[in-house]
Amino acid sequence: KEKGMRGSIKAFIHPRIEEIQAVNGVSFSVEEGEMLAFIGPNGAGKSTTIKMLTGILYPDGGRVEVMGIDPTKKRRQLAYEIGTVFGQKEQLWTHLTPYDNFRFFGAIYDLSEEETEARIGELAERFGLAAFIDTPVRNLSLGQRIRCEIVASLIHKPKVLFLDEPTIGLDPVVKENVRELIRQMNREEHTTIFLTSHDVGDIEKLCRRIIIV
């Protein structure tokens, strides 16, 4: 819009709409159990691509498949097979404890109480959550929250885990701890990892293949 009050009024009455292609000409495949880095500058369409792969956004053209499932047609079915962590957005209810959040996620994914409790116990031990699993999320440090975010996304044993800037804002020691936990999940549960990050350490230490957009 034009500068000043006049420009603001003019833009409100006669808005100018400019069409921008967020993602165009992107084509790739990911192998089962692979740890892949999907990187590029800000505005390249990394997060938009993840949102299309997970069914949050629908592409205007082309074809998207995750494990043979079209996210635009069977998003609910796909949700049971994938997990997502957006480093700059929270999926946990901050007034609840991690434990209560995990139980809620277990119910969302139709796990029995026994299955949920067993999975919480397994992941809490693996991710070292015992000291703060009963503390409201709003009182946790950023590193503790990220660990809990990852655990929440793994409650239902997804086959694919989408990680969008999972270590953003973390100090070097906590970053390495989170990376090791991600490596462990890939190694032990054969979880496919689709990672976006501006942190070279994430890319070098986690992924064997890189796609640049």
Annotate each predicted stretch with a short phrase.
Residues T54:
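Helix-to-loop junction immediately C-terminal to a conserved catalytic motif
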